[in-house]
């Protein structure tokens, strides 16, 4: 069954990371694929991200984290989504995430982790496929992740 409205995705750069080129490339690819994209800009707090996601009624949040702060930021975003009863928002992560951290992040509710060099079509198709089956954060079977970092 086709959606009657475009998928809405919030792309955010949490923490002190100042590199946003990748997030902007992802945002443009999602937009070009027909999705409505809200880009929050640099240095967003988890509170700002969740608040914007709820206000904008998004289907998906994409976090771009290159700073190494994923183990502090992502659990806070998930906790805030749960507090706001917004667990049906699909949560995906992009950036340089070590393999040893990926499994715990996915267990906690991240549906997919996309490392550097992931084809844009892979990201678009994952979001399209999984937004349709929105449910609690842990409902979507995690996409296998393997970083290109040792």
Across the structure, where does each feature detected by a protein language model lie?
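A short, charged, Gly/Pro-tolerant segment at domain boundaries
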Residues: 140-150
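The C-terminal output helix
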Residues: 129-142
């Amino acid at each position: 069954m086709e959606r009657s409205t475009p998928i809405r995705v919030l792309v955010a750069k949490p923490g002190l990371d100042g590199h946003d080129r990748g997030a902007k490339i992802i945002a443009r690819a999602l937009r070009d694929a027909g999705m409505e994209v809200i880009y929050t800009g640099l240095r967003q707090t988890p509170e700002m991200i969740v608040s914007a996601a709820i206000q904008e009624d998004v289907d998906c949040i994409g976090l771009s984290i290159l700073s190494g702060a994923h183990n502090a930021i992502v659990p806070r975003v998930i906790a805030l989504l749960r507090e706001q009863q917004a667990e049906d928002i699909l949560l995906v992560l992009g950036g340089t995430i070590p393999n040893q951290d990926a499994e715990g992040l996915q267990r906690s509710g991240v549906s997919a982790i996309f490392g550097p060099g992931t084809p844009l079509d892979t990201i678009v198709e994952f979001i399209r496929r999984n937004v349709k089956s929105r449910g609690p954060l842990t409902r979507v079977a995690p996409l296998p992740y393997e970083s290109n970092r040792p």
